[in-house]
């Protein structure tokens, strides 16, 4: 078997900034009466006949087991005292741009992964600060002082570990993983904490008696490649803290969609839902093939009178998973006003895209 040298560039200084429960936090900032209350961004199921899905929620709501992509009905059952807010996504985008302007005060090497998180390469920065930890603290301070919002930061020598570190202490945390600490940090992590390892992959790894980073470290490269395909090559290196992917400031944002026009109009809900599922499947397959993930799902419906409706849902985390895209598409459709006209066109689109590599590849996608 052809072997590749394990080259680990530990000279860089990478920060990953992740806003804490961003949408909910913006709402709480703008409305002080929400302080200490469980806040859910999603339609109130009491007003929609039980329809709707959770986009995100604050940490108070998470104590009740509420999480993104959960049905609003289940979220209400778990936390009946929660405040449901439909969400003002244009406002969230405006705040997100304000955060990016703060990043640009320190470096132009900023790679936005979504509206509320980004990688920054501060190896060399505009203020000439040698300490990446100091830069991270200053960014957290600036975001709080200027926008009254908190974020968590991870600091390390590559994007993979910086991302893991930012999740380690939330909210408002700062975790630093130095090159000499990386191996110990990774070995102690449960395998499900490795970004991109989905539920099915966790089961498959558990079947191999892999429960932690330390367990993963024991598995040979050829075994991982044989079991997980080309991602095994990457996973072998990630277990050793090796990931030399650069911070890419000029990322091309596109959308992936599937639309179908029907010569014979669709009237029955079963037929419409079946066609939505076909579109969702096409979008998921295209996203996986293009190695893209997205966190905004849009559906488009055109009726027999050529009137057209579009509605979108922004998720807490990016996805390319068919089940998620399908479920959210159906939930969005259920929120549309009832229309007795026949359906002439249906479309599903995944947008707010990012590279699958940046999100950390899902083993399920590549095995």
Curated annotation (Swiss-Prot):
Known partners and oligomeric status: Monomer.
The entry's localization annotation reads: Cytoplasm
Q: How is the cofactor bound?
A: Binds 2 magnesium ions per subunit.
Does this UniProt record's set of keywords contain tRNA-binding? no
Query: Residue ranges of the UmuC domain?
Result: 14-198
Q: Name one GO cellular component term.
A: cytosol
Q: Which domain of life, per UniProt?
A: Bacteria
Q: Which reaction does it catalyse?
A: DNA(n) + a 2'-deoxyribonucleoside 5'-triphosphate = DNA(n+1) + diphosphate
Name the record gives this protein: DNA polymerase IV
Q: Gene symbol?
A: dinB
DNA repair recorded as keyword: yes
A GO MF term: magnesium ion binding
Q: Tell me the active site.
A: 117
Q: What does this protein do?
A: Poorly processive, error-prone DNA polymerase involved in untargeted mutagenesis. Copies undamaged DNA at stalled replication forks, which arise in vivo from mismatched or misaligned primer ends. These misaligned primers can be extended by PolIV. Exhibits no 3'-5' exonuclease (proofreading) activity. May be involved in translesional synthesis, in conjunction with the beta clamp from PolIII.
The entry sums up its family as follows: Belongs to the DNA polymerase type-Y family.
Enzyme Commission code:
2.7.7.7
Question: Hey, where's the site called Substrate discrimination on this chain?
Answer: 23
The residues the record assigns to binding Mg(2+) are 18, 116
